[in-house]
């Protein structure tokens, strides 16, 4: 298959082909971008698996998705025991796996394994899950990042500093940590592409970001603090300024199905400041391609999760 360096302008969900016989797994597809992507794939006759933390959330999402072949897998990314149990239940090959679930700008909290919540959920939980099921991924591993990665850093980039951040040591700044978690997604894709070539793994890693999209992600932090007024204001601003989740899902959908994409491609919206629009190939900030930082993050992630990709 010819490799492509561009996605046609105005590519949309209507360009998705029939996906009969294809299997997709999407984490965090009970709302927002993940739910929108799952809905479109199911409409094209794909067999879609979604992950959810509870049976109730899974069944509610499947009802929203509507007609189609949809199953669920219970998994809590904040609990590595749950991640391992979910991975052990993955006994089928998936054409595409989408690492989509996430939290944003939450109050300081730790996961069951002692990781800072945002980095533990957005990066470490996914790192572990994907590593445990890598032999079941056929074609693509899609990782949902954010343009907020531009706010992220890992200090002096050495392993001790990275480990401290992942463990929530030091001053907590919720937006900077969210940015670091989204930068971690991109560093993960960069290092995974290098390792894919070395190990001759069959699947291609691709990163995406949804721009500014109307999902409940922005309101979760307010909900955790019990700040009802702030939550209402956030949701009102989203309705006014953000693109709908169905539009925000387009980069993810393109990464899932558009043929010939290169490993470590990064796809986002083509509009002003990449906040909205149709999908296009783009570039992250330079730090996202720092090979030393990517290797250091990878090694620390393997150490903390006790999941080895080799």
For the regions a protein language model found, what residue spans apply to each?
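Short glycine-enriched, charge-decorated loop/helix-capping segments at active-site entrances
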Residues: 113-115, 282-287
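Active-site rim elements
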Residues: 172-179, 236-242, 284-289
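C-terminal helical subdomain
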Residues: 3, 232-281, 291-295
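Residues at the start of alpha-helices and the adjacent loop-to-helix junctions
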Residues: 50-53, 79, 240, 247, ...
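Rossmann-fold NAD(P)H-dependent dehydrogenase/reductase core
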Residues: 2-225, 304-309
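Short glycine/proline- and charge-enriched loop/turn segments
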Residues: 161-170, 227-233, 276-283
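C-terminal amphipathic/interface module of NAD(P)-dependent oxidoreductases
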Residues: 285-310
